[in-house]
């Protein structure tokens, strides 16, 4: 298991990813987050459990390739990010939905 400081856990999760595919996966208790590229699966699990007070069943990660971005004649790259697909225990789905989608 990776060593990490519990005080830095909230910094690992940047934002939730809300796309059409991610919304469909929410019906299967899978939530997608953008995390820091150097975060490991145990760190992501601990961060999600700490932030949302839920039980994480499984963590899948993907490191998509960087995309090129052109500004005038210069070619650069968009910043690299890591995508984490987190499976939540069926009993804890209401807790995470209340935090991510508060009722107005």
From Swiss-Prot:
InterPro entries: Nucleotide-bd_a/b_plait_sf, Ribosomal_uL23-like, Ribosomal_uL23/eL15/eS24_sf. SUPFAM superfamilies: Ribosomal proteins S24e, L23 and L15e. Coiled coil: none annotated. One of its GO terms (biological process) is translation. The keyword RNA-binding applies. Keywords: Ribonucleoprotein, Ribosomal protein, RNA-binding, rRNA-binding. This is Large ribosomal subunit protein uL23. The gene is rplW.
């Amino acid at each position: 298991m990776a060593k990490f400081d519990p005080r830095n856990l909230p910094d690992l999760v940047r934002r939730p990813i809300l796309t059409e595919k991610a919304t469909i996966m929410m019906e299967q208790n899978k939530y997608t987050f953008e995390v820091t590229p150097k975060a490991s699966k145990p760190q992501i699990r601990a961060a999600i459990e700490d932030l949302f007070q839920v039980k994480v069943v499984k963590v899948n990660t993907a490191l998509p390739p960087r995309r090129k971005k052109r500004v005038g004649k210069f070619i650069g790259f968009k910043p690299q990010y890591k995508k984490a697909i987190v499976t939540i225990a069926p009993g804890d789905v209401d807790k995470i939905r209340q935090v991510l989608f508060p009722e107005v």
